C-alpha cells in the first residue's frame, strides 16, 4: 500500500506544470535570502518545532533570532527547501533525505503541516500571493509531504 501511495505522490510531483514550477521557483527566489525570518515565522507559529532542536529548547525566540547559531540553522533549513524547489519536479532524493533525518526524531505529520502553514503565511506577507501562486505551492507541498508521509 505504501508503494502505491508513494507512486501517486511521485506522479503528483511530476504532474506539476511548468508554469507551477516557475511560480514556486520565482516566489521562493524572492524570500530565500531571509532564512532567519522564515525560521522565526515557523518557530513562532509552532513552538513544538523549536523545541525539537536541543540548541533552542527553552530559549526566548526573540533573543536567539539574531544569533549566529540561529542564522546557521535557518540557512540549513531554508537551503534544504531551496534544493527541493530547485530540483522540481524531481523530489525523490529530497524525500528520502528528509525522512532519514526526521523519522528517527519523531517529527509528526502535524509538525510538517504546521511548518507548511507557517511558511505559506510568511510567503503571503512577502510576495504577490495570487490564486495561481497559491495553487502552485499547494500542489508542491501536497506532492512533497505526501511522499514524505508515505514513508513515515
UniProtKB/Swiss-Prot annotation:
Domain Globin: 16-152
Entry keywords, A to Z: Heme, Iron, Metal-binding, Oxygen transport, Signal, Transport
Matches recorded under InterPro entries: Erythrocruorin, Globin, Globin-like_sf, Globin/Proto, Mb-like_M
GO CC annotation: extracellular region; hemoglobin complex
Entry keyword tRNA processing: no
Family annotation (SUPFAM superfamilies): Globin-like
Name of this protein: Globin CTT-E/E'
Organismal lineage: Eukaryota, Metazoa, Ecdysozoa, Arthropoda, Hexapoda
Gene symbol of the encoding locus: CTT-E
Amino acid at each position: 500500500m505504501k508503494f502505491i501511495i508513494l507512486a501517486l505522490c511521485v506522479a503528483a510531483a511530476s504532474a506539476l506544470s511548468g508554469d507551477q514550477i516557475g511560480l514556486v521557483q520565482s516566489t521562493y527566489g524572492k524570500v530565500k535570502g531571509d532564512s532567519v525570518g522564515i525560521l522565526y515565522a515557523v518557530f513562532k507559529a509552532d513552538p513544538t518545532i523549536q523545541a525539537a532542536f536541543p540548541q533552542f529548547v527553552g530559549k526566548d525566540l526573540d533573543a536567539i533570532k539574531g544569533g549566529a547559531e540561529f542564522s546557521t540553522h535557518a540557512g540549513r533549513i531554508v537551503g534544504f527547501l531551496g534544493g527541493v524547489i530547485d530540483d522540481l519536479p524531481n523530489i525523490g532524493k529530497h524525500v528520502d533525505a528528509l525522512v532519514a533525518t526526521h523519522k528517527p526524531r519523531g517529527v509528526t505529520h502535524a509538525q510538517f503541516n504546521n511548518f507548511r502553514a507557517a511558511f505559506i503565511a510568511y510567503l503571503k506577507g512577502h510576495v504577490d500571493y495570487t490564486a495561481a501562486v497559491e495553487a502552485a505551492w499547494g500542489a508542491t507541498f501536497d506532492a512533497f509531504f505526501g511522499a514524505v508521509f508515505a514513508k513515515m
